[in-house]
Amino acid sequence: MTIALGKSSKEEKTLFDTVDDWLRRDRFVFVGWSGLLLFPCAYFALGGWFTGTTFVTSWYTHGLASSYLEGCNFLTAAVSTPANSLAHSLLLLWGPEAQGDLTRWCQLGGLWTFVALHGAFGLIGFMLRQFELARSVQLRPYNAIAFSAPIAVFVSVFLIYPLGQSGWFFAPSFGVAAIFRFILFFQGFHNWTLNPFHMMGVAGVLGAALLCAIHGATVENTLFEDGDGANTFRAFNPTQAEETYSMVTANRFWSQIFGVAFSNKRWLHFFMLFVPVTGLWMSAIGVVGLALNLRAYDFVSQEIRAAEDPESETFYTKNILLNEGIRAWMAAQDQPHENLIFPEEVLPRGNAL
């Protein structure tokens, strides 16, 4: 009898293998390597937002009340941007501005940079989570690719735009009314609705909503092997193994309606992916342009001419009036640090005068 001596063919597990096994174990909530980025960042971003909207004032940065503690509601509460004088400082708690004083840090707007940066990395972590899970179960990574679109919008609006301006002050604050204020600001100072990149973004988002509605209704309309119930919802069985709607019937229906229709499910679903993702990416590119002050005023030469020469006989369009009104109102209200006071003759007159 021969006895073979030597090392076992099974190699010893390294620390990396042990951690990898634990992180990627099949459990109710998948963790994964991406979770090391996602979970802490999401926790801190949400925690910072709830803390700021509940307790922290914006009196020192914007001259506003912005917390539930001060009487705001869900619509008016916000985590506000730092003052313009702080420019692009990261406002670290231990930095030269706050010097480790938590109260001072909150008063200076440190929670905004805290929420913005942790939020950005949290979103990136969520996209990486989709990549990681797709790789684990051998799916293609289109979910993660699609999620890159809202990440692009978040990063362009909350980080790249204020980096192109004079400071974080000009980014949106994290709140409902604050976001609407930012939209008004974009219109008045950048003529955003006339920007072709914004137009592509609107077409993408509204087009995607239309495609979703059409697709869902068409699948419901062409079910052929349903339950016995008279009602669609009682008849629907979520555990049925096979597909029970007719692509051929759907194709025939839309061919009659529009004259053209998708004949291939892959092309149909790719189009539903392509429309919103491309739209959001285009709008993100447009916001990067605005960060560099590449405004859409060039598309309304009347507005340029009216601004340069008050005596010029231009068509004083409602678009010009809207933007001038927004600027005259917001510049003084929204940028109190500038101490702007406009004389009567430069304010928009309206149609009556």
From Swiss-Prot:
Pheophytin a binds at residues 130, 143. The D1/D2 heterodimer binds P680, chlorophylls that are the primary electron donor of PSII, and subsequent electron acceptors. It shares a non-heme iron and each subunit binds pheophytin, quinone, additional chlorophylls, carotenoids and lipids. There is also a Cl(-1) ion associated with D1 and D2, which is required for oxygen evolution. The PSII complex binds additional chlorophylls, carotenoids and specific lipids. Pfam families: Photo_RC. Chlorophyll a PD2 binds at residue 198. Chlorophyll a ChlzD2 binds at residue 118. InterPro entries: D1/D2 (IPR055266), Photo_II_D1/D2_sf (IPR036854), Photo_RC_L/M (IPR000484), Photo_RC_L/M_CS (IPR055265), PSII_PsbD/D2 (IPR005868). Fe cation binds at residues 215, 269. It catalyses: 2 a plastoquinone + 4 hnu + 2 H2O = 2 a plastoquinol + O2. It is found in: Plastid, Chloroplast thylakoid membrane. A plastoquinone binds at residues 215, 262. The modification N-acetylthreonine is found at residue 2. It is a multi-pass membrane protein. Belongs to the reaction center PufL/M/PsbA/D family. This is Photosystem II D2 protein. The gene is psbD.
